[in-house]
């Protein structure tokens, strides 16, 4: 069964800063008690891959233990999670959880992900997405984002190592939460803009990095910008001062900027670190900061990092046409 809704974008705009407890007209409904389907995977399987119409899924309150795959589609797909406040992740009522290790997934990062998204132009609202495999599993993703013009609004991503893979295309993360320990915002080719995101580090490592950008050449357009966000320890966790770095270069042309972001003293005074002693990958990196605040923004930074004279803009990263696919009601 396929249901289309052409007014979904209008629904998203009108729902901002309000509750979303009922499905918009025409949406496929997922509910633990029934709905159209009881699993998210079955609802996605019911979508048409060939229609150019917008297709919408609404997920009712509950915890769904499944691995979700949204394949490439011809038209836009919008997924809404039930929430008491569309403007934030704090009141989300839908959690998707799964636990699979890198080894059990055939040594594929992507195949460990709780939510694998390869749909261009997809919009995801108010979902908690967790990989609960933990420290023993090493790489274990919550999200694997592999397509252009993807937007995540009021979402909560939790894991330990490699929580969020922003791999290809232009991507937006806004009013969201990202938690992890090791390289937990990573990828190779995406241009990703993170705004008003609460980044939380967990206890456990003696030294670790938040980002690991894998841009490997001058011609690769990959860029991660964390804008107007916060960096701190996960609530209740005891993280020693200076344990974490803002990033390390997965490849030698890595590009990451933190700007206008508040940082607690969990961030090391060097700010940034090498990939490893034997493979530093620092000669061509762009590791920048602008107008950050808090104890974690202080100190003498690594020699390969820089203080920027001006902030980057969203058009610098996502292009001048970003308003054609981004839900601008969140700005």
From Swiss-Prot:
Coiled-coil stretches noted in the UniProt entry, renumbered to this chain: none
**Biological process (GO), any one:** cell wall modification
Q: Which UniProt keyword terms apply here?
A: Aspartyl esterase, Cell wall biogenesis/degradation, Hydrolase, Secreted, Signal
Q: Which domain of life is it from?
A: Eukaryota
Ranked from the top, the taxonomy reads: Eukaryota, Fungi, Dikarya, Ascomycota, Pezizomycotina
**PANTHER family of this UniProt entry?**
ACYL-COA THIOESTER HYDROLASE YBHC-RELATED, PECTINESTERASE
Species of the source: Aspergillus aculeatus
Q: What is this protein called?
A: Pectinesterase
Record's subcellular location? Secreted
Q: In which pathway does it act?
A: Glycan metabolism; pectin degradation; 2-dehydro-3-deoxy-D-gluconate from pectin: step 1/5
């Amino acid at each position: 069964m396929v249901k289309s809704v052409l007014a979904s974008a209008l629904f998203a705009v009108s729902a901002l800063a309000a509750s979303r407890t009922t499905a918009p007209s025409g949406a496929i409904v997922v509910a633990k008690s029934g709905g159209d389907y009881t699993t998210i995977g079955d609802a996605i399987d019911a979508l048409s891959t060939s229609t150019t119409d917008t297709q919408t899924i609404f997920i009712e309150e509950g915890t769904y233990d499944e691995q979700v795959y949204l394949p490439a589609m011809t038209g836009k797909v919008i997924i809404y999670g039930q929430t008491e406040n569309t403007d934030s992740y704090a009141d989300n009522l839908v959690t998707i959880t799964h636990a699979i290790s890198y080894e059990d997934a055939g040594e594929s990062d992507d195949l460990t992900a709780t939510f694998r998204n390869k749909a261009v132009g997809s919009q995801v609202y108010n979902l908690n997405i967790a990989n609960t495999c933990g420290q023993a599993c090493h790489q274990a993703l919550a999200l694997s984002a592999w397509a252009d013009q993807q937007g995540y609004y009021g979402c909560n991503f939790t894991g330990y190592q490699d929580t969020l893979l922003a791999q290809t295309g232009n991507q937006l993360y806004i009013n969201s939460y990202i938690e992890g320990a090791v390289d937990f915002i990573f990828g190779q080719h995406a241009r990703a803009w993170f705004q008003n995101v609460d980044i939380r580090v967990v206890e456990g490592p003696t030294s670790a990095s938040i980002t690991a950008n894998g841009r490997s050449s001058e011609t690769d357009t990959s860029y991660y910008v964390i804008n107007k966000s916060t960096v701190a320890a996960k609530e209740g966790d005891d993280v020693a001062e200076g344990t974490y770095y803002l990033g390390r270069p997965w490849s030698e042309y890595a590009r990451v900027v933190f700007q206008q972001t508040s940082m607690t003293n969990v961030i090391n005074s060097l700010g940034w670190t090498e990939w490893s002693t034997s493979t530093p990958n620092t000669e061509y990196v762009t590791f920048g900061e602008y107008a950050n605040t808090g104890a974690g923004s202080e100190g003498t930074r690594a020699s390969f990092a820089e203080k920027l004279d001006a902030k980057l803009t969203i058009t610098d990263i996502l292009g001048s046409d970003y308003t054609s696919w981004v839900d601008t009601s969140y700005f």
